[in-house]
Amino acid sequence: MATVLHSESRRLYSWWWDSHIPKNSKWIQQNLSDMDSKVKAMIKLIEEDADSFARRAEMYYKKRPELMKLVEEFYRAYRALAERYDHATVELCHAHKTMAEAFPNQVPFDMIEDSASSSCSEPRTPEKMPPGIQPFYDSDSATSKRGLSQLTEYLGNSETEVESLKRTLVELGAEKEALNLQYQLSLNKFSRLEKDLEVAQKDVSGLDERASKAEIETKILAEALAKLEAERDAALLRYNESMQKITELEESFSHAQEDVKGLTNRATKAETEVENLKQAHSRLHSEKEAGLAEYNRCLEMISNLEKKVRDAEENAQNFSNQSAKAEDEIKALRHELVKVNEVKDGLRLRYQQCLETISKLEREVSHAQDNAKRLSSEVLAGAAKLKTVEDQCTLLESSNETLKLEADGLTHKLAAKDQEIFQKQNELEKFQSLIEDEHSRYLEIEVSLKTLQSLYSQSQEEQKVITSELQSRIGMLRDLETRNLKLEGDISSVKEENQNLSELNDSSMIFLETQKCEISSLKEIKEKLEEEVARHINQSSAFQEEIRRLKDEIDSLNKRYQAIMEQVNLAGLDPKSLACSVRKLQDENSKLTELCNHQSDDKDALTEKLRELDNILRKNVCLEKLLLESNTKLDGSREKTKDLQERCESLRGEKYEFIAERANLLSQLQIMTENMQKLLEKNSLLETSLSGANIELQCVKEKSKCFEEFFQLLKNDKAELIKERESLISQLNAVKEKLGVLEKKFTELEGKYADLQREKQFKNLQVEELRVSLATEKQERASYERSTDTRLADLQNNVSFLREECRSRKKEFEEELDRAVNAQVEIFILQKFIEDLEQKNFSLLIECQKYAEASSFSEKLIAELESENLEQQMEAEFLVHEIDNFRGAICQVFKALQVEADCKTADQKIAKERIPVSRVLGEINELKCSLSSAEYETQRLVIENSVLLSLLGQFQSDGMKLESEKRDVEKDLETIVHHYGMLKKDRLELLEMNRQLKSELIDREQRELELKAELQTEHLKFENLHESYMALHQDYSDALGKNKSLHLKFSELKGEICILEEENGAILEEAIALNNVSVVYQSLGSEKAEQAEAFAKNLNSLQNINSGLKQKVETLEEILKGKEVDSQELNSKLEKLQESLEEANELNDLLEHQILVKEETLRQKAIELLEAEEMLKATHNANAELCEAVEELRKDCKESRKLKGNLEKRNSELCDLAGRQDEEIKILSNLKENLESEVKLLHKEIQEHRVREEFLSSELQEKSNEFGLWDAEATSFYFDLQISAVREVLLENKVQELTGVCENLKDEAVTKTTEINQIKETVGFLEFEVSELKTQLSAYDPVVASLAEDVRSLEQNALSLMKLPVPAGRRREGVQNDEHQEAAVSQEPVGHCSTNLDNGIVLLQDMKTRIKTIKQAVAEEKKRRGKLRRRSSSHRSKDRKLFEEIELEDQFSGEIRQPRSPAMTESKNGSLMKDIPLDQVADTTSYGRSRRTSRGSSDQMLELWEEAAEPESSIKFLINNKNSKKPLIPRLHRRSRNPSVESQSEKMVGVVDKLELSRSTEDNAKILERLLSDSRRLASLRISLRDLKSKLEINEKPGKFTNPDFARVRKQMKEMEEAIFQLANTNEILSNEIEETGDVRDIYRKVVMEKSRIGSEKIEQMQQEMQNIERTVLKLEEGATKSKGRRKFSESRTVILLRDIIHKGGKRTARKKKNRFCGCMRSSGNEE
């Protein structure tokens, strides 16, 4: 009929249908799109693959509520469409009736009946309705009837509305068809979902069958365990733990019995619930005849559940019987454990003895392993051992693979179970097999690591021994001989002990092989048991959750049914009279029957699960037994470790075989070391001989120099004697004799010069010979190096071969290390897996606590598993600890060798830090490379030592040559001494010559007259000769310069010698030029004093004068016959002086060897030389006087040329000169006495020097002994230097890195210098700006004054508005204070002190007080206006005015309010349905009422929004008005709600205007701005917290709903409040400090800025947290509204408003009086 009606209506109202097609209706399109999206989401949830039981459980339990939500939302959308369709059909019926009555001829009357019947049957549109939605639809039937009655009345009154209703009816018909199609599609999808759920339930039943099969398999496994009981004698080592586990199992049995009782109680409860359901179904059966059959089905399902409960009880009884059997078995096991413990004690004693012997052997081996080549032999032995261990590992792996195959066969038997359980089982099996394999591998690797550690420690010890041997090889030879003897005895003892141990090892190996078989079988059983335990635990947890959820669903169904019945009674509807309601109830009954079927299926599943639980309990008993056996397996694995240790001992025995080979290598090494030591001894001897030869050469050179100086002194003495004679005869000497003397002098000087050149040539020849010998030695060295290179090539070949062997061994070692590392990684993964298992076990414990009795059994099992896992972890930690110790040893080796620079920084950062594996491997490789390089360097050093020994041999030959040269020099010294004797003979000859001269004087007096005539001619010749003499003197000075270059070692005395030589040359020139004898004697006395003080200085210039002086003496003796007596006296004195000089020379010969030692004494004598220099200065003065005398004498000579005939005058002058000479002789005698006293002093000093020499000789002997010790230490340091050379190579890399860093630092320093220069420039610029700002500060005075006036005017206006008295006498003070304020503000940043500063501060304080008064007045005015607003809120006219004012304020602060309003509207409208076009025609009166009732709350909210918005607006206002100078009082007075903020803003305006004063004030202003913004943000956060608190208090009232999220939100809010309070306090403290301090330091300002920045970041975080809290609160509110809507959907907004709008009649309940705008919108927060 509906199709006929649709076709007829479409034909009659085509124009209306065309306008109301779904494509043309936006509302229909939106709802259809929503329904499509929800249907797609449902399909996605349904179509997901549920291959495993867990996924099906997720679909059933987790995704079921999502499906329910989607179905409910889908039903709402469909409900809206159905209501609209119902509304349209009713309107069409009424319109059709009216048209039929008006036009009976045109409209057939049958269509009316059809339409009426269809309208009656239309409400049955939802064929399948969810149980929770039925009450919503029941209440709509009454409302629809009322709406129809009102609509007919409305149609009877107006015909115009009929046409519009026709159009809407046609549109609704079209929409109804579309909705019917969509609804059918959704129902099909829903049926698919139900089918999927049924399939899932069938799968659950299949799982139950598989569980039964698994039980059968567990029985088979139990039988296998019974067979294995005979083999557990040697495996049960933990008796105490097993006893504890047995007690726990007994407790678990008792708990299991209690669980069975609990299940019976639950079954009784289920029966009571079934009875309740029967009563409910009976009620429904009385009202609904169609649902009786379905309720009968439910009863049948309940009976099935009862049967299943009975089966569960039977299973519990079987379980108790099994527990009794298990107790009997436990008793038998206890007896067996006693026996096993006895066997275990004996084995422990043996094992301890073996460990003690092993420890002794290890100690002895560690002491015996001292040589370098032991590492290679031990590495070979270790490689062989590793191969054997790898073979054993392969055997174990093959056995494990067989075990895995058996386990796989068992898993194939259990493959019928669920795929997910199968996957988990496989994963557990893999992990457990990996655990066992890795445990066995780890034990084997432990053994290998121990061996490698021992090898490594041995290598370390060997390296240390090598270094010690290199440091002290000379002393170590004897020690090595003694050690070798000891080692041979030790090795023999060790071999004997090894033989004993090998016998013990053979016996233990046989025992261990028997245990291995038992351990392998026990491992398999343990794996199976652990897998089954994990399975059963997971299944029990899932079953318990399903039982809980089913009970919850049953309770919810009962509650829903009761609610439905109550709602039917409240609606006052009779089901018998209302056919429509009956049909709807039938639909609901059908749904309920389906639900009952589902419940019955669920209950069947539960019963099956209970059976499975019983089976699981049975299996757990078996699993416990298997766990006990697995413990025995673990003990067996530990015994394996003992086996491996014993094997290690056997391997050590094999090591001792290699020790013999090592002994041969040691003997070779010892021979090499002995050769090296001999070479080193020779080297040391040669070095000492070289040093002695060098010292002797230096001594010889110094002696030669001393002899030369002594020779010169002798010559000087002779020259002095000749000068004395000269002084006596110079006045009487003839010009001819002078010319002859000068010619002889020239010839003699040339001869001496030639002699000196010959000596130089001889020395040069010697140097060239030495060079030639050195060249030959170099050639020999090159040939020797070539030979050594060939040897080196051979050695390098050998070394390369050894390196290849080392590399192969290193590779094997690295492979073993990689295996160890992999084992560690796998152990770490297993530890994580164990931790995950512990977490899972903990979750199972929590679930078992809820199910008290059943969970206790599982908790104990989990505790046992955890204890076992902890034991395994302890073992793993023990192994990890050993690995850490190994790593620590590696780190110590690295530190000792300084291989890695990062070790030091790592030790500084973290003590005993674990090195990553990759890093350890890299470092080990580096160590190996360094070891190879060290070996290569040692070989290279050996070769270098051999080369050095050859060089030392050559140096020894050179030393022999030098000794021969030394002998030659000694011969030369003997010749010199002989020459000295010849000189003495010459002296005697000179005395004879003096006698002859006396005889010749008589003859010369006769010739005197002749000579006087020839004086003039000869004087000219004399001048020419004098010039030639000066040239010769210059040549001589050049020669002296060359001699000075040879005496560079005496650099300190060089300058003094040069000065003395120059002075002596000047004195000699004057002595030759002058004929004055007195002057000659003075010069001689000064020279002697200088010579006595200087101890033989180079006075070679006097040697050249000796020959000339002899001739002069001959000529002068002829003239001075009258003065023979004086000359004899002088000769006697000179003889005495010569004797003293001879003695001094002898002393000098003794002192020549001590020149090197006495250099320090010469430094002390430098002071005496300074005194001598003072004496020389006095002599200089005397020389100046002598020069004057010489000039006078020259004048006299000229006069003598003129006065040739005046011989008488000249004779008189000669007499005068003779008198003067007598006086001078007296002076010279006094000087001689002084010299004698000085010579005595020198004798005393010489004696002291002799004493010193003796003391120094004793010290030299002591030092020689010390040098012997130092030589030994030097050899050790030499080898230390070799080691340090290796380190230098490493340090060079570090230095290069550091140089790079230094270069970077230099670049940074350059950049910093540039920056500093820039800063200096900026500082200068800033100083210039400060000077300008100082000038500008004066301009701010009127600004401050104007600000004070503005404040004053604001005060007057505010007080006049408040009708308060203005304080008198403030204008003048205010103006003055303002002026002072301007001065203070302008002067504070600069730092000047003035009187205006105090006045300005007073003015600002006065302004603060005024602003506070204004603030109080404004606050009072606010309160007063608020009271007026509250009083006037009752009147509508005043309300409208206030609303307009609020709108104005909103416009004023709309920028701040706009962001909040959308969020609030979205939060209110986000979760509701879309609006229907009919619903938009809402009643304005209801909206008006709602607006009036919520006026108070809106006013409060507006005030809060204004307070929150005020700070931000004030900040913007301040920023916008930075540069303005106008008064801002009216606007601020109008806008500000918080006068304190206004005062702060006014202050901030002043601060912002003064930001240009200086950098410090700008920083302070920025800090204040940040602090103010932070305080305002905190204020807004406080306000929002208050709002949220109020909302929570409203939503948390009793009777509404309870949600644990509220407690969490409250905690967050409390934490927010505390944080806000702390931040507010810190902001206040910082702002007060800045305001009080004013111009602070940059450091303090930076600290404050950092604190403010941190505070702002915290505030941002708090704002984000506040947003999250607001979201959670909104979600909670939405949840509350949804829960309200579910309970009170009968009073839903859409239905109520549609009914009210259309019908405008009927009674309204108290709940309908709530003011709502539309049913599709939520009410305000107050209504909620």
Curated annotation (Swiss-Prot):
One GO cellular component assignment for this chain's record is: plasmodesma
Q: What are the start and end residues of every segment in region (Disordered)?
A: 1419-1441
Origin superkingdom: Eukaryota
Coiled-coil ranges from the UniProt annotation: 155-446, 476-827, 857-885, 954-1016, 1090-1323, 1403-1431, 1576-1684
Predominant location: cytoplasm
**Free-text disruption phenotype from the record:** No visible phenotype, due to the redundancy with NET1B. Net1a and net1b double mutant shows a significant acceleration in root-cell expansion.
Any one GO MF term held by the record is:
actin filament binding
Bias (Basic residues) occurs at: 1424-1439
InterPro entries assigned to the protein according to its UniProt record, in alphabetical order: NAB (IPR011684), NET_actin-binding_domain (IPR051861)
Record keywords, A-Z: Cell junction, Cell membrane, Coiled coil, Cytoplasm, Cytoskeleton, Membrane
Q: Which Pfam families match?
A: KIP1
| Location within or outside the cell | Cytoplasm, Cytoskeleton; Cell membrane; Cell junction, Plasmodesma
The NAB domain is annotated at: 13-92
On tissue specificity, the annotation reads:
Expressed in root meristems and at very low levels throughout mature vasculature.
Q: Which Gene3D superfamilies match?
A: 1.10.287.1490
The role this protein plays is: Plant-specific actin binding protein. Associates with F-actin at the plasma membrane and plasmodesmata. May be part of a membrane-cytoskeletal adapter complex.
Domain statement: The NAB domain, also called NAB (NET actin-binding) domain, is sufficient for F-actin binding.
Similarity field: Belongs to the NET family.
User: What binding partners and quaternary form does the record give?
Assistant: Interacts with F-actin.
* Name of this protein: Protein NETWORKED 1A
Look up and give the organism this protein is from. Arabidopsis thaliana
Taxonomic lineage per UniProt?
A: Eukaryota, Viridiplantae, Streptophyta, Embryophyta, Tracheophyta
Gene behind the chain: NET1A
